[in-house]
Regions:
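Short amphipathic alpha-helical segments
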Residues: 24, 29, 74-77
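A short, surface-exposed loop/turn module that caps and links secondary-structure elements
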Residues: 30-54
Length: 100
C-alpha cells in the first residue's frame, strides 16, 4: 500500500527515539508491504468512524485514514498519540473531521 503522512504525524515522529522509533519504522515497512488492512498486525478499525484505523505501537497509537483507490490503496497517517490520550473526546473529534 502507498503511505502518506500528515504534518502532525511527522512532528510527533520527530520526537521519538530508541526502541519506539524502531518499532514505528518496522510498522511502516509492514504497511508498505501489505496488500490489505487485514494483513496488518495490531490494526483495528475505529467503530464509530468509516475509514479510520489505529495501529498499536508499544504505548503509542498511530491513527490512519484508508483511502481506497483504483490503483493501490493509500494509507495516510494522521496522528500519533500516547495510549492515554488517544481516545479522548478532543482527539476523536479531530479524527472524525479527517474521516472522508
Amino acid at each position: 500500500m502507498k503511505v502518506a503522512f500528515s504534518k502532525e504525524f511527522e512532528k510527533a515522529v520527530r520526537k521519538l527515539s530508541g526502541k519506539i522509533l524502531q518499532s514505528l519504522i518496522n510498522v511502516l515497512d509492514e504497511v508498505k508491504a501489505a496488500n490489505c488492512v487485514e494483513e496488518l498486525t495490531d490494526c483495528k478499525k475505529i467503530e464509530t468512524l468509516e475509514n479510520v484505523y489505529r495501529l498499536r505501537i508499544g504505548d503509542k497509537r498511530a491513527f490512519f485514514v484508508l483511502h481506497i483507490e483504483i490503483e493501490g490503496d493509500l494509507v495516510k497517517f494522521e496522528y500519533l498519540f500516547n495510549r492515554g490520550e488517544a481516545y479522548d473526546k478532543k482527539n476523536m473529534e479531530r479524527l472524525r473531521r479527517r474521516d472522508i
